[in-house]
Regions:
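Short, structured surface patches at the beginning of a domain
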Residues: 1-123
């Protein structure tokens, strides 16, 4: 299954830009998104208190999760690292549109995931 996750922080923001970017990204790679998960919630809220938490329980080995950028997963470093770790442990591939990275269950992915989540926190 290929999942796309979209998060905006306020009602004043729209999901359309992220949806467009993810659709374009998927089309370039000849992917078909099976499930879209969208929510309007602060990235500082715990993943378990968001639709993302349900999605993380649902995904399984071989699935792919696409986000527009790593900061859509969360704003706190430890939260993002926990989400990335959960994906890696399940052998789920995480693709980021903005950064153009493929994060899997390998050491290079773990290093990149740490660096990106740190930069998202600094922003």
């Amino acid at each position: 299954m290929i999942y796309a996750y979209i998060r905006v922080s306020t009602d004043k923001q729209t999901v359309e830009n992220q949806r467009f970017e993810i659709n374009r990204f998927a089309k370039q790679r000849d992917f078909q998104i099976d499930v879209w998960v969208e929510e309007t919630v602060s990235g500082t809220r715990s993943a378990k208190d968001r639709k993302l938490g349900v999605l993380l329980k649902r995904i399984k080995k071989g699935d792919t999760l696409i986000v527009s950028e790593i900061s859509r997963l969360g704003r706190r470093l430890m939260e993002v690292m926990s989400i990335l770790n959960a994906c890696m442990l399940k052998n789920v591939i995480l693709l980021t549109v903005k950064e153009k990275y493929e994060l899997g269950n390998n050491i290079q992915s773990q290093i990149l995931a740490f660096a990106f989540s740190l930069s998202a926190q600094i922003e």
